Amino acid sequence: MSSPRWQEMHQALTAAGLIVQKSAENRIENLQSVVPLIEAANSSGVRLLNANSVEELLAITSHESEVQSDSVKPNSQTTLPKSENEGPIGRVIAPLQRPHLTPPRPRKPSGFSSEDFPLEASEVDSDIEIHFDITGKSSTEGRISDMQSCFRSRLSQIRDMMLSKGVLPRRPLANSDAWRNRRRHNSKDYEITIVGLASDVKWTRTGSLRFIVEDESSQIMCILKPPNDASPLHASLDGLMDDEIVGVSGWFLTGERDPIFFSRDIHKPPLGNHSKAQAGEEYAVSAAFLSDVHLGSKTFLAPQWAKMIDWFKNDPLARTVKYFVLSGDGVDGVGIYPGQERHLNIKDLFNQYGELARMLEEVPDWVDVVMLPGNHDAVRPAEPQPALDPEVQQDYSNTVFVGNPCDFSLHGVRVLSYHGKSIDDFVATLRSVTYSKPEMAMQAMLERRHLAPSWGGKTPLSPEPEDRLVIPEIPDIFVTGHVHGHFVGDHKGTLMVHSSTWQDQTDFQRMLGFQPKPCILTVVNLHTYASEAIHFA
């Protein structure tokens, strides 16, 4: 079965972690949407779709639709833990019909305070300092020894953070030493702490979290019960990412069965309240953030882009913008997914980059562009990704090309920019994270001090001998993209920006019921940290 519609359906099911057998293909292709099937499979714990399981899941969705109006609020999502915010959470259901595109409305001048955005960018010289970029520094050969070195590096870096910042109640034991003395450490009076990579994370029937903690010496099976006062973000309720670094305090339960480590508490890497650096008053310019332009796609919003260029040239707020950060997927690419060609209006990859260069030439010359790659760009898919090839770069001016992720400073303000592919893994694993709230994934990355912990998930990773996806320094501004949402907010002193897209809703997003938030330019002043979200749609 190879129709374009089936390919899109199959892609959606695969993205949801479902395996489709041949016997179920005809039945699924006849469905109007696979969204109810995916939701029923997730709530039932089903991963293999055959003829029988599909019929059973469809029966569940049919029954739920009959009782929904009497028992459930239309926008509620019962698979997530209850939060303090009683508003609806989860996916935003998008219209089934493709929206009719109308010309963009003329913009009024931005209403902003000159105290928040005090300086024109043309008066200030550029000051971009790159702290880390993988370009030209990748040394992996893809061997098992490289993978082992990468995980040892991750464990060593984050364990040292835990020890230096005092987040552990005592000095941790090596797993081998803890196991050797398990009969001594068999009650709360003899509690110990271990630190390692979490894996094989599962919830038991009683609601406890069962997982393995592995360090350089051995593995130990652990179990964690939700505390009575646990918040929805506590690991016992929210979950753990495979291969994230955790500390665990507790004791061994020994008896007739194999000993298991009873976890009284779990410890995350340190993330205190961060004090942001500020650009000096004489450098009080702004940075603008955008991602996922997807030039070359038929759903690229060209009229709105022209409107943004007009804003850059004429709006008083735009005159404060010194830097324009594009966090990946500047073009839609070629051959990224099956059937992509029919969604493209520029089908040659170099022509896509050439047209993007021409469009960026229209940005005023006082603005410096910082461009990262993403999963649609012409670089290796494995992260960390190097900058775009010099053959592509030669068409651009006033553009600094960096890798993904990139840790850099603008007039002393530390910025961590990451395209955000691993948000897919956070959505698939943690109960608190949804595509409609990408800021929860960003918060989880900061709390774990790692951008993409899970090996073998939805995010391809390069096993560099030193794990360069660890977050060694807390950024002043943390920027992501990828899922076509938008958010600006603070988490423990770090300003989080989830950059908007310049692509309309795609067929794939419509099938998933996801409504993007396109054409929003985020502007942040580097001295005052005042921010403005400029809407162009």
Regions found by a protein language model. Name each.
Residues 1-537:
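Extended recognition/assembly regions associated with phosphoester-bond processing machinery
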